């Protein structure tokens, strides 16, 4: 009884701490929360468990971009990632296996499809020529409608070069994805499939989809302006079909180089934008026409050669990759530029000029396809 009175007066715990008459102590009750050692040290007793340490919650690793607010203030080019969780593998090298084979397979399919596309285009040009003659004859006998919106659109479309017509579809796709970023209910889906990150659960498809993804209007406008400016030159060099294959392959290859750099340095984070593919276009044109003159849009007075511009860009991206600058994905830029230089120097001879076996196989399929009617002769 003396012990019970001392506990009640000194610890202020009530009768729950009193010993039973039969000796020993009964189990502690959690109906009251005893206070020990003043206000700063509160221990809550669990029933039938004594003093048990609360289990520690293990949280998955988040993107290595500092705090969410700091990352968003530092760069407006990436989407907000407050609720995004990434899962880096305990064996980082293994995460590169699937992207590596995806890069090889997609590049092969892109160039194979471009070769078949070119074959079909050449085959349909004769028919298109006669269709054009017929259309001109019909236009000559039909009464012309002044101020027709469709006529004005056709006139504008016909005034574009082949390169500008080709990149118009690419620009439209980028604009569509940019609009999807503005839909709040699609944020998680967009971050998962339209940003590339080796710590994400989805590795392969974002390597292509992120090439058409921009979160910032300024980022998209700058990339599309550069693409539009170099579109005529690159299509004149490669042709429409080969350019599309190079552009899509460059987006995947530049993202794979970015994956390798992020895994090697341990600096995981999402990337998006067409900069890697556009760097391939820029590097290809500058390598093919190194004496060409370029200028900055806001400083047209200062001009420089394309060769010097390419050297400066490669030097800046190399420094950014080594020093760990986070505003741009310098590894993707550098990978795209090196791919553009390699393709103009060697890739065109190794890949595009060896497409004839595939074209012959496709020609045989188109010519000797399954005959209608069947039956024996």
Swiss-Prot record:
Positions in coiled-coil regions: none
Family statement: Belongs to the peptidase S54 family.
Transit peptide start-stop: 1-50
Subunit-level organization: Interacts with PSEN1 and PSEN2. Binds OPA1.
Cell location: Mitochondrion inner membrane
InterPro entries: Peptidase_S54_rhomboid_dom, Rhomboid-like_sf, Rhomboid_protease_S54
Chief localisation class: mitochondrion
Protein's membrane topology: Multi-pass membrane protein
Gene from which this protein is expressed: Parl
Mitochondrial intermembrane membrane side: 120-165, 229-242, 288-293, 353-377
Protein's name according to its UniProt entry: Presenilin-associated rhomboid-like protein, mitochondrial
UniProt keyword Transit peptide present: yes
Modified residues (Phosphoserine): 63, 68
Keywords: Hydrolase, Membrane, Mitochondrion, Mitochondrion inner membrane, Nucleus, Phosphoprotein, Protease, Serine protease, Transit peptide, Transmembrane, Transmembrane helix
Function: Required for the control of apoptosis during postnatal growth. Essential for proteolytic processing of an antiapoptotic form of OPA1 which prevents the release of mitochondrial cytochrome c in response to intrinsic apoptotic signals. Required for the maturation of PINK1 into its 52kDa mature form after its cleavage by mitochondrial-processing peptidase (MPP). Promotes cleavage of serine/threonine-protein phosphatase PGAM5 in damaged mitochondria in response to loss of mitochondrial membrane potential.
Protein EC: 3.4.21.105
GO biological process, one term: negative regulation of intrinsic apoptotic signaling pathway
Modification after translation: P-beta is proteolytically processed (beta-cleavage) in a PARL-dependent manner.
Deleted gene: phenotype: Mice develop normally until 4 weeks of age. They show subsequent progressive growth retardation, atrophy of muscle, spleen, and thymus as well as severe apoptosis of T and B lymphocytes leading to premature death between 8-12 weeks of age. Mouse embryonic fibroblasts lacking Parl show high susceptibility to intrinsic apoptotic signals. This defect can be complemented by Parl or a soluble form of Opa1.
Reaction(s) the record says it catalyses: Cleaves type-1 transmembrane domains using a catalytic dyad composed of serine and histidine that are contributed by different transmembrane domains
Disulfide bonds: none
Organism whose genome encodes this protein: Mus musculus
Active site location: 275, 333
Single GO MF descriptor: serine-type endopeptidase activity
Stretches in topological domain Mitochondrial matrix: 51-99, 186-205, 261-270, 317-330
């Amino acid at each position: 009884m003396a012990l019970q009175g001392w506990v009640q007066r000194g610890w202020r715990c009530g009768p729950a701490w009193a010993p039973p008459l039969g000796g020993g102590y009964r189990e502690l009750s959690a109906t009251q929360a005893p206070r020990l050692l003043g206000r700063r040290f509160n221990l809550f007793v669990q029933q039938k468990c004594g003093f048990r340490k609360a289990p520690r919650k293990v949280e998955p690793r988040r993107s290595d971009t500092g705090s969410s607010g700091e990352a968003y203030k530092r760069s407006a080019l990436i989407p907000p990632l407050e609720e995004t969780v990434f899962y880096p593998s305990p064996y980082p090298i293994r995460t590169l296996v699937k992207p590596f084979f995806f890069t090889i397979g997609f590049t092969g399919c892109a160039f194979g499809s471009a070769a078949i596309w070119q074959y079909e285009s050449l085959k349909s040009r004769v028919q298109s020529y006669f269709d054009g003659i017929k259309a001109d004859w019909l236009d000559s006998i039909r009464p012309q409608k002044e101020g027709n919106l469709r006529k004005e659109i056709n006139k504008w479309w016909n005034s574009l070069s082949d390169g500008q017509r080709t990149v118009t579809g690419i620009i439209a796709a980028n604009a569509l994805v940019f609009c999807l970023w503005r839909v709040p209910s699609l944020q998680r889906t967009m971050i998962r499939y339209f940003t590339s990150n080796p710590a994400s659960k989805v590795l392969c498809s974002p390597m292509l989809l992120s090439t058409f993804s921009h979160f910032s209007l300024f980022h998209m406008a700058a990339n599309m302006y550069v693409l539009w400016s170099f579109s005529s030159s690159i299509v004149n060099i490669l042709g429409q079909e080969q350019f599309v294959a190079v552009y899509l392959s460059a987006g995947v290859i530049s993202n794979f180089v970015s994956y390798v750099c992020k895994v090697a340095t341990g600096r995981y984070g999402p990337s998006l934008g067409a900069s890697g593919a556009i760097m391939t276009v820029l590097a290809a044109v500058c390598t093919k026409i190194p004496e060409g003159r370029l200028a900055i849009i806001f400083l047209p007075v200062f001009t420089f050669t394309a060769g010097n511009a390419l050297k400066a860009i490669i030097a800046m991206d190399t420094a950014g990759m080594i020093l760990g600058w986070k505003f741009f994905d310098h590894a993707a830029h550098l990978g795209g530029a090196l791919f553009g230089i390699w393709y103009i120097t060697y890739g065109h001879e190794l890949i595009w000029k060896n497409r004839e076996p595939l074209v012959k196989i496709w020609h045989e399929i188109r010519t000797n396809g399954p005959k209608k009617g069947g039956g024996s002769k």
